[in-house]
A protein has these predicted regions:
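Sec-dependent bacterial lipoprotein signal peptides
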Residues: 1-18
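Aromatic-residue-lined binding/catalytic grooves and analogous aromatic/hydrophobic interfacial grooves
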Residues: 217, 222-250
Length: 261
């Protein structure tokens, strides 16, 4: 028994030196996707699009903060400081931004990959791929709208449409535009509305998966909200808000039997 124990210990000790080599310690890029070869069909495009949705789910964005921040920034709610979250802040951000800035731009980068794909050369249902790119346009608009609300200066000292907005990024890692300048709030609103209108024209309800994904009706609803919000800086947008709201279909909603409209 003692001899068996010694042999077991010896072989276990020996395995420390022979079990792995230098090659096993080197990381691989097996999970990376080459943008030139990684998107080959409709399903690949959907897979990339899903990663944009995934980047919107952390607690720092739509997983929590984005949903409650409107109330937290007012007198409606306050933090009891028990968790250390949402305590007083001087808003002393670094030049590179803080808060949801980086999270949102990472999601925008994924949308730009989808939008930049040449779907004519991909295999699969062209209608489905057009719908996916439409989702990317609408989602890119929503993401920039969230940035504009957080970082735009259009409500600072009556700055209006000519005040600083945020960089509106439409390409993925463009070498000539890696550090884009901030556009005006008015230009941001124009780009946001343009992306939403493009997305609406490209999406098809036949390809809707669930309410967890962007749809044409969802884009109309966001367009109405964007135009209503932007009307404070450009009153001509109120007409767009009305038109978009009237385009949203409510036929799938069922009112309680004792209610009336």
């Amino acid at each position: 028994m003692k001899k068996l124990f010694k042999l077991t210990f010896f072989f276990s000790f020996l395995m420390l030196f022979v079990a792995c080599g230098d090659d096993d310690l080197e990381p691989t890029l097996a999970q990376d996707k080459d943008l030139n070869t990684g998107i080959n069909n409709a399903d690949d495009l959907v897979s990339v699009m899903n990663s944009a949705y995934d980047r919107m789910t952390p607690s720092g964005y739509y997983g929590r903060n984005q949903v409650i921040m409107g109330d937290v920034r007012t007198d409606n709610l306050y933090s009891n400081v028990n968790s250390g979250r949402f305590t007083d802040s001087d808003m002393d951000y670094s030049p590179n931004g803080a808060g949801p800035w980086s999270t949102i731009y990472r999601a925008i980068a994924i949308c730009n990959i989808v939008i930049g794909a040449d779907i004519a050369g991909l295999e699969g249902d062209q209608g489905k791929m057009s719908h996916t790119q439409g989702q990317a346009h609408a989602l890119r608009a929503l993401l920039h709208f969230d940035l504009l609300q957080d970082y735009g200066q259009h409500f600072v000292n009556g700055g209006g449409a000519g005040a600083l907005g945020v960089p509106y990024v439409k390409t993925y890692k463009d070498p000539a535009n890696l550090s884009p300048a901030r556009d005006t709030a008015g230009a941001n609103l124009g780009d946001i509305i343009g992306d939403l209108q493009t997305g609406i024209s490209m999406m098809n309800d036949a390809y809707n998966i669930s309410t967890s994904y962007m749809t044409k009706m969802g884009a109309y609803a966001i367009l109405a909200r964007v135009a209503l919000y932007g009307g404070a800086a450009d009153s001509s947008l109120y007409a767009t808000a009305t038109s978009a709201a009237e385009s949203v279909s409510y036929t799938h909603l069922t009112l309680p039997t004792n209610s009336s409209v």
